[in-house]
Curated annotation (Swiss-Prot):
Species the sequence originates in: Cavia porcellus (Guinea pig)
Bias-annotated ranges (Low complexity): 251-268
Membrane spanning residue stretches: 48-73, 85-110, 121-143, 164-187, 207-231, 389-413, 424-444
Cytoplasmic topology ranges: 74-84, 144-163, 232-388, 445-464
Residues in the Extracellular compartment per record: 1-47, 111-120, 188-206, 414-423
Protein name: Alpha-2A adrenergic receptor
GO biological process per UniProt: platelet activation; regulation of smooth muscle contraction; regulation of vasoconstriction
Protein's UniProt keywords contain Disulfide bond: yes
PROSITE patterns found in the cross-reference section: G_PROTEIN_RECEP_F1_1 (PS00237), G_PROTEIN_RECEP_F1_2 (PS50262)
Omega-N-methylarginine: modified positions: 367
A single cellular component GO annotation: plasma membrane
Function per UniProt: Alpha-2 adrenergic receptors mediate the catecholamine-induced inhibition of adenylate cyclase through the action of G proteins. Component of the ATAC complex, a complex with histone acetyltransferase activity on histones H3 and H4.
Length: 464
């Protein structure tokens, strides 16, 4: 992402990010643009291998993130405003794959900067901007999830498309503030002295910028993400550990301000419908007589890390007038509850059973302890699954980016980092752009269904 490495002798720098040292480089002569002989750092076989691997990375990144964007705009289940975060994140990753990685690859295999000074400045700015934006997006998504859980009614009524777009604009502004000023306003260090024979493309290498940009682009967002996700996990764990035997009668919470209508969503919670008709997050009901504490029966509490939850429910997908008899719905709900497997979503209850956690509280409720026990086992499985997803999200993010930013900061304070190791970390960070669609969508049923619909249109009736 950033184009600075250890300060080897400047006459040995053929380019800005991956400068070979004088002892280990193997160079092959090639014909340069001006007719002279230029040095290339790799043999033909290694060059072809690198081009194929990075080309595959580019294709996977573009394909996966384009699928995410199409799914959000075409699937009814993904119309929730918070899914705009994923659209913006996917757009940033696509831009990294199309406007940054190809030029980084050319810079690497050619051994010098071929594309001129003007594009060098643009390329450096876009490189830092897009990669920083991708990281800050993940931080914004984690904060959005945290607020939607801790301030369920208030925040979810305010979570409008306009507000989400404003947050997205803020993310891009923060990324630009980190990226652009040093490239435009400050003179690059080491500008004097003998100029190298090969054109280079270098970013600001002043110590203050390396440290501050590393903190702003990675360490601060990463710390926020970890703290927020730990808090989300603690909340979800506390809610899912309330057993059915200790739960009091569920009472319907008072209608939220603003005249929002409430609909049962089949999860033991109720979904608020805002003035614009957009569905908000499930509104909490009372647990053990404590108003405002969300009921622990809903899988959305346990699955707090499913970043973009479904905005539809089973009853909403049926056409009007297609309601089944209550008895049949109740039987189907019980049958599905008894078939919960580890990692599966909990069964959704019939519309008439929403908000009824105990026997005798409503006509559409589920009676008997068997269904409750099944739901409780399902919640335990969801907690395990939640732990796994949490580990994947934080682990992959840190694994991809921490090595690069750590070694990048070490070089600023004068520590020696092997050139090959730094190059590996540099390219490994780019892999996060291709992994984001997997991490943030494959664990969500609505995205899986949308992907199947996009890729297998001939099977549309079965999927929808």
């Amino acid at each position: 992402m950033f184009r600075q490495e250890q300060r080897w002798p400047r006459q040995l720098w053929p380019m800005g990010s991956l400068q070979p040292d004088s002892g280990n480089a193997s160079w092959n002569g090639t014909e340069g643009p001006g007719g002279g002989t230029r040095a290339t750092p790799y043999s033909l076989q290694v060059t072809v291998t690198l081009v194929c691997l990075v080309g595959l990375l580019i294709l996977l990144t573009v394909f996966g993130n384009v699928l995410v964007i199409i799914a959000v705009f075409t699937s009814r289940a993904l119309k929730a405003p918070q899914n705009l975060f994923l659209v913006s994140l996917a757009s940033a990753d696509i831009l990294v794959a199309t406007l940054v990685i190809p030029f980084s690859l050319a810079n690497e295999v050619m051994g010098y900067w071929y594309f001129g000074k003007a594009w060098c400045e643009i390329y450096l700015a876009l490189d830092v901007l897009f990669c920083t934006s991708s990281i800050v997006h993940l931080c914004a998504i984690s904060l959005d999830r945290y607020w939607s859980i801790t301030q369920a009614i208030e925040y979810n009524l305010k979570r409008t498309p306009r507000r989400i777009k404003a947050i997205i604009v803020t993310v891009w502004v923060i990324s630009a503030v980190i990226s652009f000023p040093p490239l435009i306003s400050f003179e690059k260090a080491g500008g004097g002295g003998q100029q190298p024979a090969e054109p280079r493309c270098e970013i600001n290498d002043q110590k203050w910028y390396v440290i501050s940009s590393s903190i702003g682009s990675f360490f601060a967002p990463c710390l926020i993400m970890i703290l927020v996700y730990v808090r989300i996990y603690q909340i979800a764990k506390r809610r899912t550990r309330v057993p059915p035997s200790r739960r009091g009668p569920d009472a319907h919470a008072a209608a939220p301000p603003g005249g929002a209508e409430r609909r049962p969503n089949g999860l033991g919670l109720e979904r608020g419908v805002g003035p614009g008709g957009a569905e908000a997050e499930p509104l909490p009901t009372q647990v053990n007589g404590a108003p405002g504490e969300p009921a622990p029966a809903g899988p959305r509490d346990a699955e707090a890390l499913d970043l973009e939850e479904s905005s539809s429910s089973e009853h909403a997908e049926r056409p009007p007038g297609a309601r089944r008899p209550e008895r049949g719905l109740r039987a189907k709900s019980k049958a599905r509850a008894s078939q919960v497997k580890p990692g599966d979503s909990l069964p959704r209850r019939a519309p008439g059973a929403a908000g009824s956690g105990t026997s005798g509280s409503g006509p559409g409720e589920e009676r008997g302890g068997g269904a409750k026990a099944s739901r409780w086992r399902g919640r335990q499985n969801r907690e395990k699954r939640f732990t796994f997803v949490l580990a994947v999200v934080i682990g992959v993010f840190v694994v991809c980016w921490f090595p690069f930013f750590f070694t990048y900061t070490l070089t600023a304070v004068g520590c020696s980092v092997p050139r090959t190791l730094f190059k590996f970390f540099f390219w490994f960070g780019y892999c996060n752009s291709s992994l984001n669609p997997v991490i943030y969508t494959i664990f969500n049923h609505d995205f899986r269904r949308a992907f199947k619909k996009i890729l297998c249109r001939g099977d549309r009736k079965r999927i929808v």
